[in-house]
């Protein structure tokens, strides 16, 4: 595991209720975005003037995260480069009288960035990076897990990670996920979350008929997970129908064992950047939002 320490100038007290770790899986090849993802990692595709993944990082930092674990592919270099200091660039900006740009390229303050390498051979699926990170989550500890090819833009300066952590704590639970409210026309095209009367997770119904949909919330792949779910992600076999190691299988196993997962509603504009059309929509939307 590689680690970059970014100017740790303060010491923060940690409480039992503070979630200080986040896992961001970014090892995918981004095949839907080929050929550009042959040379640009999917999570580093620009939306506006920032890479996709940095919008996620900014959200979780606002929630108090101090350790960010990127699960990267074996050939990954760009995420590492983005989050470390570039001395030559800094020197150039100073010489050119562009010191006002230095804060834009400065390393994150008071945050440690870790890199875990996901092997290119072996299992495939969303539970693989979560299982790899399991050893860095202590018993009784909670961590955010956010997939690295999508984000929510919030013009209010708020944090979906902070909102989800507050919801989990308010319900006295140790796990939660955010649902993304979708338009009616999209409900038959996606997995829709079913909740119980308390607003806790029951299951995901894939592509339901509109009249049979239990809600308008799709899974946004934005989680608070406990150590037990991390271990389930590490140990469960591949899904027998699809042959992939799926995080939803670990979540379903946790529910089947009596676990309870809170469901919240994400705020902001959803930016899906894993497909050409989604990435273009995200850039168009950000251009409009930033122009206002």
Predicted regions located by residue number:
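A structural signal for short hydrophobic beta-strand segments in well-ordered beta-sheet cores
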Residues: 44, 193-195, 263
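Conserved beta-loop-beta/alpha segment of the NTase-like Rossmann-fold superfamily
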Residues: 79, 89-92, 101-195, 234
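N-terminal glycine-rich phosphate-binding loop and ensuing alpha1 helix
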Residues: 17-95, 99, 113, 157-159
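Residues at the starts of beta-strands that form the adenosine-phosphate
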Residues: 21, 66-68, 142, 174, ...
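Catalytic-core segments of class I nucleotidyltransferases/pyrophosphorylases
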Residues: 144, 157-158, 162-165, 169, ...
């Amino acid at each position: 595991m590689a680690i970059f320490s970014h100017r740790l100038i303060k010491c923060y007290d940690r409480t039992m209720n503070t979630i200080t770790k986040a896992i961001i899986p970014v090892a995918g090849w981004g095949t839907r975005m080929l050929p550009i993802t042959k040379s640009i990692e999917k999570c580093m595709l620009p939306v506006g003037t920032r890479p996709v993944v940095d919008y996620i990082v900014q959200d979780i930092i606002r929630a108090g995260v101090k350790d960010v674990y990127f699960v990267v592919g074996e050939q990954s270099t760009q995420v590492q480069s983005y989050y470390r200091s570039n001395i030559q660039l800094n020197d150039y900006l100073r010489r050119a009288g562009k010191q006002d740009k230095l804060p834009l390229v400065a390393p994150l303050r008071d945050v440690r960035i870790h890199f875990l390498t996901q092997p290119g051979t072996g299992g495939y699926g969303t539970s693989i990076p979560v299982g790899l990170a399991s050893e860095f989550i202590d018993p009784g500890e909670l961590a955010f897990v956010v997939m690295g090819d999508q984000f929510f833009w919030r013009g209010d300066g708020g944090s979906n990670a902070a909102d989800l952590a507050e919801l989990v704590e308010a319900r006295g639970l140790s796990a939660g996920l955010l649902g993304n409210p979708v338009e009616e026309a999209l409900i038959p095209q996606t997995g829709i979350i079913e909740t119980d009367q308390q607003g806790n997770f029951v299951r995901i119904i894939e592509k339901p008929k509109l009249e049979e949909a239990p809600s308008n919330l799709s899974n946004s792949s934005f989680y608070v997970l406990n150590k037990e779910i991390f271990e389930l992600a590490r140990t469960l076999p591949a899904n027998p129908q699809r042959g992939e190691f799926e995080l939803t299988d670990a979540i379903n196993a946790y529910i089947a064992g009596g676990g309870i997962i809170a469901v919240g509603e994400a705020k902001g504009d959803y930016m899906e950047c894993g497909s050409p059309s989604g990435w273009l929509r995200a850039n168009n939307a950000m251009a409009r939002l930033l122009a206002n």
